[in-house]
């Protein structure tokens, strides 16, 4: 996938945060 240096970095961070929150939700349930 293409990554814009400025927005790409923030997108990656948010993606990782979403992944972590999803994992947390799965483990919580």
Curated annotation (Swiss-Prot):
Activity is stable between pH 2 and 9 but decreases at a more basic pH. The keyword Lipid biosynthesis does not apply. The keyword Transmembrane helix does not apply. One of its GO terms (biological process) is killing of cells of another organism. It comes from the Bacteria. It is found in: Secreted. Signal peptide: none annotated. Keywords: Antibiotic, Antimicrobial, Bacteriocin, Secreted. Its main location: secreted. One of its GO terms (cellular component) is extracellular region. Thermostable. Activity remains unaffected even after incubation at 100 degrees Celsius for 30 minutes. Has antibacterial activity against strains of L.monocytogenes, L.lactis, B.subtilis, S.typhi, S.aureus, C.perfringens, E.aerogenes and M.luteus but not against E.coli, S.sonnei, S.pneumoniae, S.faecalis, P.aeruginosa, K.pneumoniae or P.vulgaris. This is Bacteriocin. It comes from Lactococcus lactis subsp. lactis (Streptococcus lactis). The lineage of its organism: Bacteria, Bacillati, Bacillota, Bacilli, Lactobacillales.
């Amino acid at each position: 996938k293409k990554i814009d240096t400025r927005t790409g970095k923030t997108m990656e961070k948010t993606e990782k945060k979403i992944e972590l929150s999803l994992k947390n939700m799965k483990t919580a349930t």
